[in-house]
Structures are given as C-alpha cells and as structure tokens.
Amino acid sequence: MPRLLTPQTPVHFIGVGGIGMSALAKILVDRGHPVSGSDPRDNPTVQHLESRGVTVFKEQTAECIQSVLATNQQPPVVVISTAIPDTNPELENARAHQLAIWHRSDLLAALIDQQASIAVAGSHGKTTTSTLITTLLIEAGEDPTAVIGGVVPCLGSNGHSGQGRLLVAEADESDGSLVKFRPSLGVITNLELDHTDHYDGLDDLISTLQRFGGGCERLIANYDDPILQEHFEPTAWWSNKQSENIAFAALPLQLDGDRCTARFYENGSAVGDFTLPMAGLHNLSNATAALAACRMEGIPFEALVEGLAQLQAPGRRFDLRGTWEGRHIVDDYAHHPSEVRATLTMAQLMVSSGRSPLPSPPQRLVAVFQPHRFSRTQQFFEAFAEALQNCDALLLAPVYAAGEQTIPGVCSNALAQRIRSLRPDLEIEVAENLNQLTDLVKQRSRPDDLVLAMGAGTVNSLWGRLTE
C-alpha cells in the first residue's frame, strides 16, 4: 500500500457520512483531491460534504464504482471502515477492478506520517481531549490540521486542513487499528475494557495500546489511571492528584457546576492557576492532558491560559440542545458505565451547587439512557445498574443493537428491574420505542429539570422529537 497520495489521486469513501470518514474526506477536499463517497443517510454531514463538492451516492451499489471510474482519469483509492462488510457490493466491485483499498486508519496513518502530529488514544475522553488540544493550539495562533471524532466548536467541523506544522488526531482503539500510527506525540487518557467484540480481554487491550505507545516518538499518559501506571513507561506523566515526580499536574482548587479552578505544575513547581469553563474531574483530566501536550510542543503557558477561557466541549459531550417548555435538554455520548457515572456526577453537581452552564439553575436531574449494543449491556450489566442510580428519575430506551443480534434476557426491562432492587425509591420508566420515550419525557419531567439524554445510538434525536 502506498503511504502517500498525490494531490491528483481520486479518493472514494464507502460510508462517507460517518464521523471518522467525513473528517478525512473534508481534509482531502481541502487539499485538492477529487473526493466521492456513498452513504444512504441524508444527514447534515452528508449535506455539508455535498456543499463542498463531494459527490455522494445514496446507495452502496456496484454502479457507484463504475461511475467513479468513468468520471476520473486515474483509478481511485477506495477507503473503508471496519463497519463495511466484505459483502458490500461497492467493495466487491472495487476488488474486482483491483483498486487500491485502504482502511480509514491507513489513510489517517498516511496523513500522520506527513507532518508533526499529536494522536490521542484511550478508553474515555479521546474526543474531548483532542478537541481541547486543537482549540488551545488555534487560540495560541497555530493552525493545526484536525481529524476528530466529534465537531470541534471553534471550527464547526470534525475535519480541518490547517496550514500549521501540527496535526491533531483522535486514535480510536475500538478495532485495534491505532497500532498503525507513528505520531510525534502520543497521548493515552486512560484504559478500561470495552469493545469486547474485538478484544479478548484487558490484557489484549493493554498489549494493543503498548504497541501504539511504542510507535510514538514521545508519549504522555495519565498517572492517575492504575492500569497505565502499572503497564506503561511514557516520556512524561500528568496527574490531578499529585505534583511530586510528575511532569505535568493540575491540582483542583475549586470544583463547581460550571467550572473547575486548578493550579498547574511542571516538574513539581507551580506555574500558575487557571479556570476551565467545564465541570467535572474527568474534564479537568482531559484539559490537563491537553495542556501537557501543548506544553510538550512548546506552546507558552500564558498563551494556553488565555485559550482555556475559550474552551468548549465537542458536540454530543454534555451538549445543551435547548430549552423545551422549561426543561433543559442535554445530549451526551456516554455509553460505557464509567462515562455514565462521570456524566451523572457532573450533572448532579450542577443541581446541588446551583451553578451550571444552563440558562437557569436545574432543580432535578432526569436521566434518559439508551443502552448501546447487547454485548456491552450484558458485559457491564451490574456496572450500568450502579451508575444509573445517581439521578432523580430514570427513563430507559430499548437497547440500540448497532447491528448485533439480540441476547436473551439482556434488555432495558431487566436493567430497570435490577436498578429498582438497588434503589427502590427511584422513579424508573422503560419505553418500548423512541416515540414512547419522547412521550415519557413530556409526562415525567417538569420545568427546571435537567433532562440528560445519554447513549451512542439514536437517543440524540430526542431534542428534534420534542420540538417537531
């Protein structure tokens, strides 16, 4: 496989509307490549790509490849993701024509190889940390290329072809393909078993991330994560618990429902204080990683402090969609028990402290959760039951299959029953579908409630359903 693309090389993405694929497509368009793709979804991402001149076929058929071959003087490179099965007719036809077929990680690896780069890996916080790094670099006067798994607020996009020396990329561990990356600087936020459809167990995940770390010129990692502390020897550590013998530390001074104030240390010496306009210790950890990465790249701390004031979380990370009949509707991507726990803890702090980024102080927390994948729900059943108790009312949607077959006994009703056994006083309702879920939100929530919709599936449509 060639490691570089010439500007004239056409590139065709099968499934171009996905968050990872669309980011790469946007960058290649900006760099002058003829770009096409296919996607049956007519979502805002696809519409944006079409407005940028990308030809998007609405069906994934063999004829798509025929059309791309007919309209380009050179044969295209065909890009796929792990979600594309071998039986996809486009992919089969591309193979029949002996076209170059790259996994999206191959294309990202090629971009990483072309310039100095920062790649962010880890089980949780990748999108937020890579978004914060991108934002801090931009606010410091840099213009990085960015390939992120969410929309970066200051860019309004998940993909950006910058003119600066750095590339910032989110390194997804879900399929193990991040071992292909050779960044100038690697970041590992934390490690916890997930994606058990790919990994045999925690040791397999650790081994994969060790291979990623071994491919980085320099590596920074979270000292507060016990798995990282035991199994990794990075170039530098960061911490939110101690500053002694730690390269970068941010020790919290005050935690509120709408911000964190912390003191930043380098090699044990206090450098200065900063305020992060985001709540939660998990976000302070993400911001500390971002500060550490930028300092490793030589960005002055003073410039970073100014940039911190402009930080916003990426899309679907505690994303205030709006206020509906007095209820604050927030969307969050949390779909692992640790993410659910951290998000609910942050939301409860907003309720208890009376301080939040919401238009008015919330009085109650109504959690709306859509479990993602039957296998994940089964594996972390008890952990989900423990995490989801931390609210004033809980509304559950059916499990979002994400292409999986159902598993007998694994369902939202079973999860609700287990949560009731742990906390009998908690008001819990289970919806049969998203329409009924929307009705339950209308019936069970009150004005001044914080309605927090969590999940990686279709629960993010709640705001649109309420306002249609």
UniProtKB/Swiss-Prot annotation:
Keywords: ATP-binding, Cell cycle, Cell division, Cell shape, Cell wall biogenesis/degradation, Cytoplasm, Ligase, Nucleotide-binding, Peptidoglycan synthesis. Its EC number is 6.3.2.8. It is an enzyme of class 6 (ligase). Signal peptide: none annotated. InterPro entries: Mur-like_cat_sf (IPR036565), Mur_ligase_C (IPR004101), Mur_ligase_C_dom_sf (IPR036615), Mur_ligase_cen (IPR013221), Mur_ligase_N (IPR000713), MurCDEF_pg_biosynth (IPR050061), UDP-N-AcMur_Ala_ligase_MurC (IPR005758). It is found in: Cytoplasm. Cell wall formation. HAMAP family: MurC (MF_00046). This is UDP-N-acetylmuramate--L-alanine ligase. It comes from Synechococcus sp. (strain CC9902). The lineage of its organism: Bacteria, Bacillati, Cyanobacteriota, Cyanophyceae, Synechococcales.
